[in-house]
Amino acid sequence: MASALNSKIHPPGTCASSKADARGGSGWRMDCDPEMHVKMCKKIAQLTKVIYALNTRQDEVEVSVESIREAHQEDLQDTGAETRTRLPQEQSRTSEDAETLLKRIQTLENALELQKRLTQEALAESASCKLETKERELRVEAEHAERVLILSKEMLELKADYEKRLQLLTSHEGPQWGQLSQESPDATAESSQRPEMHQVLLEVERLRAENKQLSQDYARKAEELQATYERENEAIRQAMQQSVSEALWQWQEKESGLRKNFQVQESALQAQVRKLEGDLEHRGRKISDLKKYAQKLKERIQDLDVQLREARQENSELKSTARKLGEKLAIAKDRLMLQECHVTQKTDDMKTEDGVLGKRDDLEACSLHPQQEQGFPKLCHCRNGGSETQTKKEASGEMENMKQQYEEDLRKVRHQTEEEKQQLREQLGKRLEDLVKKHTMEMKSVCSTVEVERKKLKEVEAQLEEVKTKSEREIQQLQEEKAALSTKLQNSLLEDPCSRPKKPARDEGLEKLTDEEESSSDEEERTGESVKGKSDLQPPFESVMKEKAVEIGHRPEDWQSQRTKLQTQAAECLNKDSTDSLQAHLLELQALEDNARQELQEDCEQMQVQQSGLLESLRQELTEQRVACCEHQKALEMLQNEFRAVGPLGKWQATNQCPGDRRDHTFITEDMGVTGPPGSLPCAAEKGLLEENAQLQDTVLRLRAEVDQHLQEALQLREQHRLLEEDQKAQRAMEVEALRQEHRKEMQAMVADFSGAQARLQARLAALETELKESGEKAGKGTSRPEDLQLIGRLQTRLKEREDIIRQLTEERRFHYAAFPSAVSHRNRSFSFNPHPGYLTPSMKKKKMEEVPSRVVSVPNLASYAKNFLSGDLSSRINAPPITKSPSLDPSPSCSQPYKPTQLLDGKTASRTQDGEPAQPKEAPQKQGSPHQEWFTKYFSF
């Protein structure tokens, strides 16, 4: 301004040094201020670019972390869905396999029972056949021995009689023939006795004929007896052969049928075993595949955890770098503020120096040209007065415009803050309502689950009571049956002395029964303990209720961590339960299959041993029967030989008696005299034989009756033993069926508990998934997350702090201008972001340090950040109080007053008005603001 005034007042060529000095000072000021501001703004822009790049990188990292989380959650959901889909399938398969195995076991047991029954029947029939054959052999041997004894006795008697008769005859014939030879010379004398001799000879002949007839009758009777004996023996032999052949045929048929049945059963069992082995291999493969898949999932989860940790570390590093950069930015801003203060001080010093130089120039001009100054005082005064009025009008217009803009900005800011507050309140209300609804739904679901589980526990207790009552009844029945069996066993032991060696087996059966009863009682105790364990599930439900209450009291920030933990726990529990259940089922199936295989092998071995024993016994019986038949044949041949030997002896006796007719006369006479009539001897022998035969038949009948009685008693004892064994088997089968039913019930209860726990976990997972989906949908729709709420709270606090800062700044500005009116700087504030360029208090520094954002969210937030600074700058310009006039600014023609910067402004305005440019002062701030806007759009439009 001073240079312009001097150029107007002084003619060219006068006071060049003063003009050059003035131009140099003003040029240095104009060159220094924009460059410094541009440099500082460029530095700020670079720092903002770096911050924006860091923020974008952090956003990208957060997006990647969220994508990884979503992928992890999707993987967990997929794995959970797969496990859910596979678990019921595998459970159904295991249940079906268990049912099929149980059916197969039942069929096998039925087949084994049938085989055992058939074997028992076969053994009973074989034993009965053995007994019958032995009895028949004994009968035949006894009859044969009796007949042999009878015949031998008869032969001995006949021999004794014959020898006696021979002795008598020999003893009587010797003296008779001697007497006859002595009396032969006297034959003539005894001629009178010839008719008597003739009679005697006739009687001898008659006796010989009778003897011949008797011998013939005896031979005929012996032949008849031998024929009858041979016939009976042949009939017995044929009957024995027929019975043996029939028994052999039957046994062969039974053996072939049993072999066929055993072969069919063995083939079926082998096929079943192969099928079971294939099923086991297939299941083992499935289990190995599932284990591999679970291992892969675990590895993938570990990789995702590692990626999450790395992302978190990167995020923390980025946050630390952002904080460091924010601190550096704050330090740079402080440095820039200090530099601005230093520059303002330098500019003030330069202004004062320019004023001093202008005063010197004026004084020199006044001293050199006093006459010229006397001619132009009125014109200068008029021009100075016009320029002051114009500047005042322009300043007042600018102040009004600034006030209007500031008021409009304040209205907009207030309107925006009110709208944001209303939106936040609505969002908070909606979120609270949603949370209340969720908590109520969770409480209702928990209560419903607790009620359902209580009902289930009551049902289980009722079932257990029924099972206990049934078990008690069964125990009572078993005890009664045990007592009855013990009494029967005692009676049978007392009745049958032959069954004494069978006591240990029965004692072992009783011990087995007691062991089975003890095992059933132990299983009942186990079921009771399992029921107690189920009844003890109520405290965990109460703990779950408490945990729910605690979770309801937690802050909303902990929900995500709890959800993730619950998901991981649920997945782990499902995996553990599935693996444990599969392992338990596999172990049980393996145990059942091993038991079935062992039982089948043992039964097959027993049947083979029994069959081999039966075959050996049959072979021995056949050999014994053959030996007995051979012995009988030999005995018959011996008897035939004896009879044949007896036949020629009789004939020889007859021939020996024929030539001795004379001797017979004396023999018969003496015999008649001694023994009586000759016809009495064969009659007595026949009577004795008949009596002996009758006695022998009576003894045989008695023996047969006794044998029949013994057989009946043995059959009764066998039937009693068989009934006892059947009763024991039935009791054992009942006990086994009861144990199987209890095992099935326990398995069903375990499956029901597992399915219930799985359903609960699935419901809980579904609830958590729905909550996560709702939270994700709300986040996608624009609902406020906890992070958003925190950001909103921070923004609200910052807005409040900025409003407080603006108020304090306006008050301090007013106070400052009221106290120091001469400290106002007339520099261009278009590039400055500081409302107080040369005034910093400790409170202001603290507030500015607090105002430094820890994280710039996005580009719109940067724009709002810059707008807030611009609005602060504008507010500082608008709220600046009007400059009070000092007496130095009053127009006066005196040159002794100090020169002020306002005079320079007046000179500039006067020069512009003199050149005929009245609209330039109003357009000056616009021209100064336009480069600032261009620079701002250039550096902040990324």
Curated annotation (Swiss-Prot):
Keyword annotations of the record: Coiled coil
Keyword Coiled coil in annotation: yes
Compositional bias annotation for Polar residues: 885-900
Biased composition (Acidic residues): 514-526
Cross-referenced Pfam families: FAM184
Coiled-coil positions: 89-150, 196-337, 387-495, 575-619, 686-815
Stretches with biased composition (Basic and acidic residues): 504-513
Record InterPro entries: FAM184A/B_N
Region (Disordered) location: 1-26, 73-97, 486-542, 880-934
Family under the similarity heading: Belongs to the FAM184 family.
Annotated protein name in UniProt: Protein FAM184B
Organism: Mus musculus (Mouse)
